[in-house]
């Protein structure tokens, strides 16, 4: 949703987990019927989608653009699965080697949301990826 030239990492992980359970996952289209729509945005200033255009049973909004304290379900957060197929226009992989931060900057919510820096397991790479974009906030601060 944010349109900042990167795929939404949370949606990629959610899509992979839902597909692994046998659910059909696709981008929502107006006037189509859906049991559930998952929406995620990183920034509060990102305009919201008009969900009234959808025939949907439930809309679940997540990400720091909606709720600073919200978290992905633990099974999704701990999964290495990532569905790059929902973003075919991006020819790269996304990767984090740590989450959290060593600092407590007043303008940033990473430390509040993710805690102190800790190493995380790398996620699956894009099978069609030509390079890796490392989105690690503290790549050089991680002692491991």
Regions found by a protein language model. Name each.
Residues 41, 63, 136:
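A cross-domain feature marking catalytic cores of carbohydrate-active enzymes
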Residues 8, 45, 83, 121-122:
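Alpha-helix initiation/capping motif
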Residues 16-18, 88, 92, 130:
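Residue-level signal for the start and early helices of compact helical domains
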Residues 34-36, 46, 93-98, 102, ...:
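Conserved Radical SAM active-site core
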Residues 1-58, 66-67, 141:
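A short, structured N-terminal alpha-helical element that caps or precedes a catalytic domain
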Residues 54-114:
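Catalytic core of nucleotide-activated saccharide and alditol-phosphate transferases
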């Amino acid at each position: 949703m944010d349109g900042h030239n990167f795929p939404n990492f949370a949606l990629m992980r959610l899509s992979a987990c839902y597909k692994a359970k046998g659910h059909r996952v696709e981008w929502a289209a107006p006037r189509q019927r859906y049991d559930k729509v998952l929406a995620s945005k990183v920034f509060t200033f990102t305009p919201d989608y008009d969900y009234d255009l959808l025939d949907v049973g439930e809309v679940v909004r997540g990400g720091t653009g909606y709720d600073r304290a919200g978290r992905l379900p633990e099974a999704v957060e701990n999964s290495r699965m990532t569905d790059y197929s929902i973003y075919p226009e991006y020819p790269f992989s996304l990767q984090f080697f740590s989450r959290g931060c060593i600092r407590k900057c007043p303008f940033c919510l990473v430390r509040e949301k993710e805690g102190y820096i800790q190493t995380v397991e790398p996620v699956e790479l894009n099978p069609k990826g030509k390079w890796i974009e490392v989105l690690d906030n503290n790549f050089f601060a991680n002692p491991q």
